[in-house]
C-alpha cells in the first residue's frame, strides 16, 4: 500500500507509470510485412493487428499460443429498483452454466481453441444500490481491482475480457454518463430486454445515481467506486495487469468497455494495449467507443456479453499473427515482387 495508506493511491501511481509501446518490435513487423507474398496493405486491418501485437508484446514475430477468455461475474444492488426482466439470481445460475459448458461463450471458446476462466465476485453480496449509496467503499473497490489482476496468473499471451451480471448495463450507462456527459438517454439501452416501464425505471436509476454521486465524479476511480460493480472493477484490474506483463487485451462489449473507459479517463494511454472485439447492439456502446477513439473489429449485432464478441475477435487476431509469421517472403517463394 502507498505511504498515504489510501487504497486507490497505488492504482493511481500504476496508471500514471504504465510501460509504453515497443516501437522497435512494431517497426520490425512492418518491415517484414512488405516482403511477404502479397500486395502491400492487401490484408487490411490484419496488418495493423499484427503490428499492434508486436507493439504490446515486444515480440518481433508475435504469436498467439495461449489465448484466454476471462469472464467476471457480479451482482448489483440497483436491481432492487426493478430495472431488468431477469432476477439477480440469474447471474449465479449463468456462472453454473459456464462451468457446465452450456453457454454461448463455451461454444465459441471450443470453436476458436481459447481457454476460459470464470470469476464470480461475491455474488451473494450485491454492491450497494447506486441510487442510494456508493456501490463500494474504496478498500473493497481496490481489493476487487487487485483480484482482477490475478486473472492472468496462470499465463496467457492474449487476454479477452468479458462479464456476466444482471443489471450491469445500467451500471455501464451510469459510468459512461459520469465520464463523458450527455443525458441518460444517450447511454441507456435495453440490456437483457428492458422496455416500457422497465426502461423508464432504468433511465431514472441512472439519472438519480449520477446526481447523487456528482460531488465525487471528477476522479475516474471514484466513478468506479460510486457507480461501478465488482466485475467492472475486476476487469479494470485485469486490463492493468495485462499491460504490466506485456499481454494484449481484447475487450468485449458495452460493460467491459465501461471498465476500460474508467482507465482511459484516468490516462488515455492506459488502454493502448486494448483492442475492442466488436461493437454491441446496446446503443451506448458505439458512442462509448467513439469517445475513446476506438474502432471495433466486428459488428455482428450481438449484445450478449460473456466475452463472446471478444472471443470471436480473438480468432481474427490469431489469424493475423499466423499470416505474418507463416507467409513466405517474395524471395523465399521465388515470386516476383512489385516494381
UniProtKB/Swiss-Prot annotation:
Give the Gene Ontology MF terms in alphabetical order: nicotinate-nucleotide-dimethylbenzimidazole phosphoribosyltransferase activity
Name the pathway it acts in: Nucleoside biosynthesis; alpha-ribazole biosynthesis; alpha-ribazole from 5,6-dimethylbenzimidazole: step 1/2
EC assignment: the record states 2.4.2.21
Q: Which GO terms describe its biological process?
A: cobalamin biosynthetic process
What broad class of enzyme is this? transferase
Q: Which reaction does it catalyse?
A: 5,6-dimethylbenzimidazole + nicotinate beta-D-ribonucleotide = alpha-ribazole 5'-phosphate + nicotinate + H(+)
Q: Which Gene3D superfamilies match?
A: 1.10.1610.10, 3.40.50.10210
The active site of this protein is located at 306 (proton acceptor)
Q: Which residues cross the membrane?
A: none
Q: Which UniProt keywords apply?
A: Cobalamin biosynthesis, Glycosyltransferase, Transferase
Write down the InterPro entries for this protein, in alphabetical order.
Nict_dMeBzImd_PRibTrfase, Nict_dMeBzImd_PRibTrfase_bact, Nict_dMeBzImd_PRibTrfase_N, Nict_dMeBzImd_PRibTrfase_sf
Highest taxon of the source? Bacteria
What this protein is reported to do is described as: Catalyzes the synthesis of alpha-ribazole-5'-phosphate from nicotinate mononucleotide (NAMN) and 5,6-dimethylbenzimidazole (DMB).
Under the heading HAMAP family, the entry gives: CobT
What protein family does this chain belong to? Belongs to the CobT family.
Protein name (database record): Nicotinate-nucleotide--dimethylbenzimidazole phosphoribosyltransferase
Q: Which organism is it from?
A: Brucella canis (strain ATCC 23365 / NCTC 10854 / RM-666)
Amino acid at each position: 500500500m502507498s505511504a498515504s495508506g489510501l487504497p486507490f493511491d497505488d492504482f493511481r501511481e500504476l496508471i500514471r507509470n504504465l510501460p509504453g509501446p515497443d516501437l522497435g518490435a512494431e517497426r520490425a513487423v512492418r518491415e517484414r510485412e512488405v516482403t511477404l507474398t502479397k500486395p502491400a496493405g492487401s490484408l487490411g486491418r490484419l496488418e495493423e493487428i499484427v503490428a499492434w501485437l508486436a507493439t504490446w508484446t515486444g515480440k518481433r514475430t508475435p504469436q498467439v499460443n495461449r489465448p484466454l477468455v476471462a469472464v467476471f461475474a457480479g451482482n448489483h444492488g440497483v436491481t432492487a429498483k426493478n430495472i431488468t426482466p431477469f432476477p439477480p439470481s440469474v447471474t449465479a445460475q449463468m456462472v453454473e452454466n459456464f462451468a457446465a459448458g452450456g453457454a454461448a461463450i463455451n461454444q465459441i471458446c471450443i470453436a476458436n481453441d481459447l481457454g476460459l476462466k470464470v470469476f464470480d465476485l461475491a455474488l451473494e453480496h450485491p454492491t450497494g444500490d447506486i441510487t442510494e449509496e456508493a456501490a463500494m467503499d474504496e478498500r473493497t473497490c481496490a481489493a476487487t481491482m487487485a483480484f482482477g489482476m490475478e486473472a492472468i496468473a496462470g499465463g496467457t499471451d492474449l487476454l479477452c475480457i468479458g462479464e456476466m451480471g444482471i443489471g450491469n448495463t445500467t451500471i455501464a450507462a451510469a459510468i459512461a454518463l459520469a465520464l463523458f456527459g450527455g443525458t441518460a438517454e444517450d447511454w441507456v439501452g435495453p440490456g437483457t430486454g428492458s422496455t416500457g416501464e422497465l426502461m423508464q425505471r432504468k433511465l431514472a436509476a441512472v439519472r438519480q445515481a449520477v446526481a447523487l454521486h456528482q460531488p465525487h465524479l471528477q476522479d475516474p476511480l471514484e466513478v468506479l467506486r460510486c457507480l461501478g460493480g465488482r466485475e467492472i472493477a475486476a476487469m479494470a484490474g485485469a486490463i492493468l495487469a495485462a499491460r504490466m506483463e506485456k499481454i494484449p487485451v481484447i475487450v468485449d462489449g458495452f460493460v467491459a468497455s465501461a471498465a476500460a473507459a474508467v482507465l482511459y479517463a484516468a490516462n488515455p494511454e492506459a488502454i493502448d494495449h486494448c483492442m475492442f472485439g466488436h461493437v454491441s447492439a446496446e446503443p451506448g456502446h458505439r458512442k462509448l467507443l467513439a469517445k475513446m477513439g476506438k474502432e471495433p473489429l466486428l459488428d455482428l449485432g450481438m449484445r450478449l456479453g460473456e466475452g463472446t464478441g471478444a472471443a470471436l475477435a480473438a480468432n481474427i487476431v490469431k489469424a493475423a499473427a499466423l499470416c505474418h509469421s507463416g507467409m513466405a517472403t517474395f524471395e523465399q517463394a521465388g515470386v516476383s515482387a512489385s516494381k
